[in-house]
Regions:
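Conserved alpha/beta-hydrolase catalytic His-Asp/Glu region
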Residues: 129-135, 147-207
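Short beta-strand/loop motif that positions the catalytic acidic residue
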Residues: 208, 214-216, 220
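Gly/Ala-rich beta-loop-alpha elbow adjacent to hydrolase catalytic centers
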Residues: 97, 101, 105
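Flexible "cap/lid" loop of the alpha/beta hydrolase fold
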Residues: 106, 110-154, 160
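Catalytic active-site module of serine/aspartate enzymes centered on a nucleophile-bearing elbow/loop
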Residues: 238-272
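Active-site loop/oxyanion-hole signature of alpha/beta-hydrolase fold enzymes
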Residues: 5-17, 37-96, 260-264
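Short beta-strand element of the alpha/beta-hydrolase
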Residues: 23-31
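Active-site glycine-rich loops that stabilize anionic/oxyanionic intermediates
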Residues: 31-34, 99
Length: 272
């Protein structure tokens, strides 16, 4: 069921599934430049894959049905997630994020650690952008400003989907294209700026004291397996899972395998 919250800057929208008084609440935060549709397979399988849990899947500000923040930033995105929890009557939750959603999860931990029961860091990395990466993001911002979001879609598809998916699943390629093309230019520019400005989360890793899943597609070239290994090594007691035949969007590319990995993690952590 879709929920909407009025905020000072506009509105925040999310899907709310499962029993309202469930013992475990899972939040799934999408990447760049997606919306909650990234998690369509997890939403569809919720009742069977994660039984008796409550699932909250937001559109980050500037994407989907959520309006942009006046000033973009990972802290602002994290605070929007906290506002969603407040509106949903949720004190603590499992916070999961993919790619940019992982950056939001790091910010949420720094700002709202008392509300985190567990973390799921998927196809993401801890370090800040290199100078080269920042320059590429500035070029993306210039392109979107000048020519619109559609001009960057083919490049994003090539970067985000693994070669196995691109070769074997044209329907999923088309699904991602639709998802990317509906991203508002203002949201894309705000999020890209936020990623340029984000801090290095490497020092954050050793402060994480809750059960943590680090998950990565074996074909991910944007945040490769080596990044996941480095994160997992720095987070005490974390669980590392590599997803075969998946690129940067493993929950979309290999949903059954990812759902099983999430369920096993939650079960071991006694959260399922």
């Amino acid at each position: 069921m879709e929920q909407t919250l009025a905020l000072p800057h506009g509105t925040l929208s999310w899907d709310d599934l499962g029993p309202r008084h469930s013992g475990t609440v899972i939040v799934l935060v999408h990447g760049f430049p997606h919306d909650r549709g990234l998690w369509s397979a997890q939403v569809a399988a919720h009742a069977s894959a994660f039984p008796a849990t409550r699932l909250l899947v937001p559109d980050l500000p500037g994407f989907g049905r959520s309006t942009p923040l006046p000033v973009a930033g990972m802290d602002g995105y994290a605070d929007a997630v906290a506002a969603m929890l407040d509106a949903a009557g949720v004190a603590t939750a499992v916070i999961g994020g993919l790619s940019m959603g992982g950056y939001v999860a790091f910010a949420f931990w720094r700002r709202h650690a008392h509300r985190v029961r567990a973390l799921m860091l998927m196809d993401t990395r801890a370090p800040a952008d290199t100078d080269g990466a920042r320059e590429k993001r500035r070029e993306l911002i210039a392109t979107v400003t000048r020519d619109g979001v559609g001009t960057i879609v083919p490049t994003l598809i090539g970067q985000q989907l693994g070669p196995t998916t691109r070769s074997n699943d044209p329907a999923l390629v088309s699904q991602l294209e639709v998802l990317l093309r509906r991203a508002p230019a203002s949201g894309v520019i705000g999020a890209a700026t936020s990623m340029i400005d984000r801090i290095d989360s490497t020092p954050t890793l050793e402060t994480i004291t809750v059960p943590t899943l680090v998950l990565v597609g074996e074909e991910d070239t944007l945040t490769p397996v080596s990044d996941a290994i480095a994160m997992s090594s720095a987070i005490r007691g974390s669980r590392l899972v590599t997803i075969p035949s998946a690129g940067h969007l493993s929950p979309l590319e290999q949903p059954d395998v990812v759902n099983a990995a999430i369920a096993e993690f939650l079960d071991v952590a006694e959260l399922l």
